[in-house]
Amino acid sequence: MLRKEIEDTSCALLCYMFLGYYACSNNILKQYIAMMFVMTAYLNYNQKKYIKFVILSILAFAFHYSAIFIIFIMCFIKKLQPSFSKYWLSILGGGCASLILNQILSLIIKLVPSASGYDVYINWRRSGQFRLIVAVIGMLITYMILVYFIIKYKENIKLVSERRYNEIIFLIVGLGINTISIKMWIINRVAIYFYQFIILILPTMFEGMDINKRKKIKTYLYLLMFIYMIFSSIFLGENEYYSYNTVFSGDIPISDVQYNMIHGWGK
């Protein structure tokens, strides 16, 4: 898929590794499979391959409940033009929404009864853990810098690929969701549905630059992503089944199933 969409596949691979998508494929496997189907579904929708789009959307939904809403949002917002005003509005809006997050989630659960299984997260004690809050803030800062550069050079992207240009809005939406998740870290997993398009967008941005500028900015951004990879391994180092605890979490590594049973989240 990557070879069809971009030329600089080595850059895409580094984004995949350094920004934690490989880690996601090991840790939250069901959602990661849904994420892949979401991306491929959207790409087929963009190419007007509607039968494939429907099939891939159903497969995404089969692996993770949230996928169908993400696909709908992507198709709805894809014509919005990326800009710095939307960039700041997304972050500010996310910050304001986080203040009334519990009320918003309660309303969604009332409107969509089938989502009632998620009400356990409203008062989930792990949302207040210091390391998880730091992890979410670290991700937000990293993507704020990356998306800032992408918007700055958006015209370069547009010259190379109109489709990649239109996908910048997904990163901006991801920033808003990422900001909300400071209050409840688990929502951060929704942000990565939108963030994953950076794997396609960043190589396209570099492709539209002159050689000297490309080399300089690549060095800075690769270093940033590498630091983020180490940072996220320390502060967000957990697995769907087994926790990768560090000196910052301070607990003996136990399975999340055991953790939930100990703290009253098991049935």
Stretches with model-predicted labels:
Residues M1-E7, Y45, F206:
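Transmembrane-helix signature of membrane-embedded glycosylation machinery that interfaces
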Residues L2-L19:
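Transmembrane-helix signature of polytopic, membrane-embedded enzymes
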Residues G20-C24, K52-F76, L175-N178:
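Membrane-interface alpha helices of multi-pass inner-membrane proteins
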Residues N26-Y32:
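Short acidic/glycine- and proline-prone juxtamembrane loop motifs at membrane-interface regions
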Residues V38-I51:
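Membrane-interface transmembrane helices that cradle and orient dolichyl/undecaprenyl
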Residues M74-F194, F235-Q258:
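Alpha-helical transmembrane segments and terminal signal-anchor/GPI-anchor hydrophobic tails
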Residues W88-G93, D210-F231:
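Signature aromatic-anchored transmembrane alpha helix within multi-pass, membrane-resident enzymes
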Residues I192-K216:
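Hydrophobic transmembrane alpha-helices and their immediate junctions
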